[in-house]
């Protein structure tokens, strides 16, 4: 249900750090939104450190684009901005000015995961009951 695309300077994060960040982002999102962790996706993409600019000047920040279903209030969106950012800084030792995080909301009916159309915001309980078997299959696959 959520996709966090983390764009980082090439060779700036080792595998253990990526694992810790993915786990932290997943756990924050799952706790704030109250969804199973299997519906949180995190991907890391490395970019050439000389290819990123801010204000026309070279910059080597880490950029996180979080895509999630629309409908969450400003308090929830605020938590989804501040908590992953704080986790990132805690895991990496980076300072807040070294990370840029934005959220992109999409209509749930424009989203699909594991072959299932996703529920509209507020309809998760009914949807979960209707897809118990598929969700169990996803959990068993890891």
Annotate each PLM feature.
Residues 1-142:
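A domain-level signal for the structural core that forms small-molecule/cofactor-binding pockets
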